[in-house]
Amino acid sequence: AGILLFPRHLHRVPAWQSHLTRAGIPFRLRSENRPLAPGEVLVADRFGELRAAYAMAHRAFVGGTFVGGGHNFLEPLAQGVLPTIGPHWEHFAWVGKELVDQWVCTATTPQQAAQSLLLPAPPRHAVRAAFAAAVAAKTDGAHRIAHLLTPFLESRIHP
């Protein structure tokens, strides 16, 4: 088990290196391609590895959610990982509050977020299946609307 840090923008990797060094936290870059030592933080410095990381994770904190906007918490859910987010998820409000209330741990402080990450992880297959069912319930909207509108449109075309 370890902590993996995936900066949203790779140009921020040096800033994370400086921050971890100042804090006395051992880390290594993903590009070093060596096993993670106990207590080390892995800092991702490559694109395209977040999905695989979620597939191996037990818990996930989705950054950018303690400031306005938020980031994509659907990615860990799709991999069967219950995500923890901060109070800001406006960019993903289209998902719906009921899905967030049921499948996302929302923390109001960084301390709450850290505590939630220490909780036992629910079974991956259960999270993945429940998320897939929630998404399926929200799909096919265009087809349903077309089905409802067809009689009305036909009555206008063929009065």
Model-predicted segments: where are they?
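Nucleotide-activated sugar donor-binding and catalytic core shared by glycosyltransferases
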Residues: 1-159
